[in-house]
Structure formats: structure tokens, C-alpha cells
Amino acid sequence: MHQNAIARVSHEGLAFDKNNNLHYIDELNGGAIYRYNSATPNNGSTYFSGGTNSVLRVGNGNTANATGAFSWVAFTDATGAALPGAVTITDPNGIRSVDGRATTDLAALRGTDYQRPEDLEIQTLANGDQVLYVATTTTNEVYSINLATNQIQTFVSRSTIDAATGLPVGNALTGPDNLAIDADGNIYVVEDQPGGVADIWFATDANRDGVAESLSRWATMSTAGAEPTGLFFDLGNPNVAYVNVQHPTSGVDRLIQITAVPEPGTTGMMLAGLLGVAGLVRRRTK
């Protein structure tokens, strides 16, 4: 069934928080970050029947890629109907929806623009705060959004230290797209690069303050024409991960399993136990 309570944008990443709010993005250079608060958050059958749509705004919303304190600016009412001034759109089937992109470009309802936001992941910290991670492909960044403190920070960027060199990672980090979280709460950043040169990076944020101390190259995919997507850690075995090999030149799409030897005293797939993973991915995807 078509439900139009959520604003019309170029949808990509989605993430639910512990209160069953749905976070979503507009996958565009200049796209914003949104939240949907269902009027019936605990009822699956009516969840998308109506709710409030809001856009993330830092300051007055006029500064792109901004960090710091943010607020949620509502542009629909609790039923999902457009607030005064919001832009609506009617599709060929006569379904009327709120145009999230056009609406949140308006001064009164403006959201902060980010550059091609893609995947979303969410994690709960030890203190109960939830942090939403957003990859922005064009600016080569990942942002962390603390939903309890209403603060957005740059989690990783080209200024983040490369653990292998002790220097800023620079353009070795290109096109962050997918995100994944392992059993220990570590964040992995998957690049979208052409020509089979995409890396998967392991981000170290030891104190969980929302800013990574370093990045380490975890795996590299050399399959011509392909990009890695959908990195996922096995819920039953924290030392097993899966990654898709998408649109290779050969035309043979694959799902690759990566198995690692865990470090003593850990349950997650830590870097020292992953020496040779890049080669494993290369061999299995050729």
C-alpha cells in the first residue's frame, strides 16, 4: 500500500531510533537530514498513516555542512499534512505528498544542506544516548549526530589520522557511502569508488565522543568496475562479515563472506586479526 506520510525526497539511508522515530535523508548534493515521528510509533499497522516530518537545522540553516547544536524544524503536522508554506506535489496517480526538498529549501522551513548524504547507522552508547551516523559522499565525510544532546559533529574526514602513517588520511578516503557497525560498536566506512579501488575503513573512536581518532584500511576491493556495498556483520558470529560486490565489469555480482581470527579478549573483528583480508577479498572477487 502506498503511504505518503513521509516527505517526498530521494530516499537512501534509513534508521529507526529507540523511540521508533524514523530518520531519513535526501540523497543529493545539498540534501538534508530528516526525522519522521509517527503518531502511532508502537503500532506497525498504522505507523505510516500519519506523523510529523522535521528537518535538521544547525543555526539558521544557511551554512552548508554545518556542525554544532541543531534543532528539528517541523514542516508537517502530526497527521503528515503540510504546514502553511510547505510545498506539495501530486504524482500521476493523484497521490499528494509534501515535497521535502523544495519545502526545506524555503527560508521559514530551511534545513541544513549536506553533500550527497547516503547511508545511516545508529548505535546506543553506554550512557543510553543514541548516535546517528551519516555518510556524505561528495565531501568525503561521516557525521555523528547525538540524538540526546542535539549535537552534530564530523566523525571522520580527510583530516582524520591514518593509523598506518600517523598523518591525515587525505584523498585516500574518497566517496564514503555505506556504513556498518560490528559487535563491539566500531564503525566501518565503505567507499563508493569506480574501477575497483574502493576501500573499507575501520574507524577508531575509543572514547565514543563522536569524533574518530583514526582510520585504518580494513579491506580493499580490486574487482574491476565494482563497488562494495551492504557490509553486514553476522548477528550470530561477530567474527564473520558479508559484503556485496556490485556491478563489476564481468557482470557477475557476488556476496563475499569474510571470516577473521579474533584478537584475545575481544568479540569483534579487530584489525590485527584481519591481516590479509584485503587479499582475501581480491582473490574471491576476481
PLM segments and residue spans:
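Sequence/structural signature of beta-propeller domains
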Residues: M1-A260
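A short, hydrophobic C-terminal helix/tail in secreted or cell-surface proteins
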Residues: E263-V281
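Short, charged juxtamembrane terminal tails flanking transmembrane helices
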Residues: R283-K286
